[in-house]
Swiss-Prot record:
Native organism: Mus musculus (Mouse)
GO cellular component, one term: pseudopodium
Modified residues (Phosphoserine): 44, 98, 121, 123, 214, 220, 251
Residue list for modification Phosphothreonine: 119
Entry function: May function as an adapter in striated muscle to couple protein kinase C-mediated signaling via its LIM domains to the cytoskeleton.
Biased composition (Pro residues): 436-466
Biased composition (Low complexity): 309-376
Composition-biased stretches (Polar residues): 490-509
Identification of the protein by name: LIM domain-binding protein 3
Keywords: Cell projection, Cytoplasm, Cytoskeleton, LIM domain, Metal-binding, Methylation, Phosphoprotein, Repeat, Zinc
Length: 723
């Protein structure tokens, strides 16, 4: 559906275009500035611009469309077409308001700023619905971070403080049941993201209780309990090697399993031990019983301080107790502690929130160096490798039937008056190519030359002409030459066996133009594309060049063009076959064309007058122009090869651009170019070296100055009379 819009000027109009003829896509509105004139005129993004001020945009390039819009006088009239693409519909799903789980360590009473315990308060939703029981231990609001108090407790008696013995006893008795816990009293601000109590025994116990409650809620089939999230069944690949190893380990005898559990209970995880057993390295770094006993001894640590800034845990927090004990200086214990740290870091993020590679790097000890574990990478041996078998050289020659087959000089001697044909080419194990001697040509009293279209070439009896590699001519391919050598030669398979090294030298002479008669003459300079040329006629003489079209000897008058010689009847236009002997021609794409065909198929189009360019072409702004069409917008003079500037879509010569658009210094009247230091004062622009006192010529940059008759003066000459 087309519609017209008229925007009231002046610009800016508030929309952006894309596309054009040079981009092979229609002009489209790609962006509309909110609140602009285009937005107020109900323009839509993606609409096609059909016409600008009544001019169709089908033949406009992107730059031409921009210039057309810029040249709009006061109002801009646009004819547009609605885009056929549907308006994109948002596919974003609405947010699901679901309760978020409480981080267990944030449920502990936090220290307030004055050192007292900060106690949470029950939510108003719990008071409003006394019949609803919610699991405060499992989930609560992420904004209030409070648990819900039981309505029975709220109605029967006062709420006990968190630190009282009765509250502790009641909370311990309610851990195994579904009843909610007793909550503290009035609400106070709490601290969040506090790492205190993250790894305490109470936190781990609460996490286990949450998991058991979610399992019971799933097994009951009555829906989710207390806003708990569903637990998905894990997809187990029973064909994986790790799963088979786990099943095999679970089916071991009880005594072996107990021994396995005893060894892996204190040091490494079960998965890491299974992998160690599969690779055969489970006994590489086993500690002795002394290390097991010492590792179970509790170690006193320094108190943990809290900070407002979140900082990563120190590497010491991931060390085992054995590594922190003073007796851990022995090589064996250092190896055990490093192994424990490596296992803890490999077990996953549940074992340690920060994986630090430094404990592994410091785990080197003489015991570990004496019996290193086998590396998973490929071992490198310093010994000499086994000698590789000596490669055999096999050169395969690609034999193709060709019209031009060189013949050794010894096997080719044409006699006058006899027909001859080239000898069939027979490959040999190592043929040597010997060029024939220089051609000798003896003209007869009446030489005749008649080219025949037949494949067999029969020379006239008079001339004794011997072909050379540079100007060799042979007849059409014979039947034996056109067939592959493995058909015509019975010994081909023995000659070119894979075990033999064969080198075949072959030369294929392609038809090309005859070289210049005088090799020491001046070289032909390359001409510009689209330059008109004329062929030069030469009379018949003792000179016998080769034709650039048929590659035959020219006997009689000939033409010279593009550095080659031609038969007059064969130098024709490549398209219309018009003779180019006496007319101008243009060389294009390795062919010659007359003026009419060149204008029709190859001549560029001027960007201003939209006509064919048959003479000198000007290339500018990614377009082609007549030299008389690409001129300065001010003085209307052609640029030639000189510099020009673009301003508002129009080209200007350097002189007019400086006079019209450049900023000039008020002191020296020269333009202030890019990179020059300048000063703006007294309503003008100055070079930093031109802003001086009009009397004493002292530089006034950064100094207080006075003005008189629009001239700067220093403080000393501020009251000068003659300025």
């Amino acid at each position: 559906m087309s519609y017209s819009v008229t925007l009231t000027g002046p610009g800016p109009w508030g929309f952006r275009l894309q596309g054009g003829k040079d981009f092979n896509m229609p002009l489209t509105i790609s962006r509309i500035t909110p609140g602009s004139k285009a937005a107020q005129s109900q323009l839509s993004q993606g609409d096609l611009v059909v016409a600008i001020d009544g001019v169709n945009t089908d033949t406009m390039t992107h730059l031409e469309a921009q210039n057309k819009i810029k040249s709009a006088s006061y109002n801009l009239s646009l004819t547009l077409q609605k885009s056929k693409r549907p308006i994109p519909i948002s596919t974003t799903a609405p947010p699901i308001q679901s309760p978020l789980p409480v981080i267990p360590h944030q449920k502990d009473p936090a220290l307030d700023t004055n050192g007292s315990l900060a106690t949470p308060s029950p939510s108003p939703e719990a008071r409003a619905s006394p019949g609803a029981l919610e699991f405060g231990d499992t989930f609560s609001s992420s904004f209030s971070q409070t648990s819900v108090c039981s309505p029975l407790m709220e109605a029967s008696g006062p709420v006990l403080p968190l630190g009282s013995p009765v509250a502790k006893a009641s909370s311990e008795g309610a851990q195994g049941s579904v009843s909610p816990k007793v909550l503290p009293g009035p609400s106070q601000p709490r601290q969040y993201n506090n790492p205190i109590g993250l790894y305490s025994a109470e936190t781990l116990r609460e996490m286990a209780q949450m998991y058991q409650m979610s399992l019971r809620g799933k097994a009951s089939g009555a829906g989710l309990l207390g806003g708990s999230l569903p637990v998905k069944d894990l997809a187990v690949d029973s064909a994986s090697p790790v799963y088979q190893a786990v099943i095999k380990t679970q089916s071991k005898p009880e005594d072996e399993a107990d021994e396995w559990a005893r060894r892996s209970s204190n040091l490494q995880s079960r998965s890491f031990r299974i992998l160690a057993q599969m690779t055969g390295t489970e006994y590489m770094q086993d500690p002795d019983e002394e290390a097991l006993r010492r590792s179970s001894t509790p170690i006193e640590h320094a108190p943990v301080c809290t900070s407002q800034a979140t900082s990563p845990l120190l590497p010491a927090s991931a060390q085992s107790p054995a590594a922190a004990s003073p007796i851990a200086a022995s090589p064996t214990l250092a190896t055990a502690a490093a192994t424990h740290a490596a296992a803890a870091s490999a077990a996953g993020p549940a074992a340690s929130p920060v994986e630090n590679p430094r404990p592994q790097a410091s785990a080197y000890s003489p015991a570990a160096a004496a019996s290193p574990a086998p590396s998973a990478h490929t071992s490198y041996s310093e010994g000499p490798a086994a000698p590789a078998p000596k490669p055999r050289v096999v050169t395969t020659a690609s034999i193709r039937p060709s019209v031009y087959q060189p013949v050794p000089a010894s096997s080719y001697s044409p006699s006058p008056g006899a027909n001859y044909s080239p000898t069939p080419y027979t490959p040999s194990p190592a043929p040597a190519y010997t060029p024939s001697p220089a051609p000798t040509y003896t003209p007869s009293p009446a030489p005749t030359y008649s080219p025949s279209p037949a494949p067999a070439y029969t020379p006239s009896p008079a001339p004794n002409y011997t072909p050379t590699p540079s100007a060799a001519y042979s007849g059409g391919p014979s039947e034996s030459a056109s067939r592959p050598p493995w058909v015509t030669d019975d010994s081909f398979s023995q000659k070119f066996a894979p075990g033999k090294s064969t080198t075949t030298v072959s030369k294929q002479t392609l038809p090309r133009g005859a070289p210049a008669y005088n090799p020491t003459g001046p070289q032909v300079t390359p001409l510009a594309r689209g330059t008109f040329q004329r062929a030069e006629r030469f009379p018949a003489s003792s000179r016998t060049p080769l034709c650039g079209h048929c590659n035959n000897v020219i006997r009689g008058p000939f033409l010279v063009a593009m550095g080659r010689s031609w038969h007059p009847e064969e130098f024709n236009c490549a398209y219309c076959k018009t003779s180019l002997a006496d007319v101008c021609f243009v060389e294009e794409q390795n062919n010659v064309y007359c003026e009419r065909c060149y204008e029709q198929f190859f001549a560029p189009i001027c960007a201003k007058c939209n006509t064919k360019i048959m003479g000198e072409v000007m290339h500018a702004l990614r377009q082609t122009w007549h030299t008389t069409c690409f001129v300065c917008a001010a003085c209307k003079k052609p640029f030639g090869n000189s510099l020009f500037h673009m301003e508002d879509g129009e080209p200007y010569c350097e002189k007019d651009y400086i006079n019209l658009f450049s900023t000039k210094c008020h002191g020296c009247d020269f333009p202030v170019e890019a990179g020059d230091k300048f000063i703006e004062a007294l309503g003008h622009t100055w070079h930093d070296t031109c802003f001086i006192c009009a009397v004493c010529h002292v530089n006034l940059e950064g100094q207080p100055f006075y003005s008189k008759k629009d001239k700067p003066l220093c403080k000393k000459h501020a009251h000068a009379i003659n300025v």
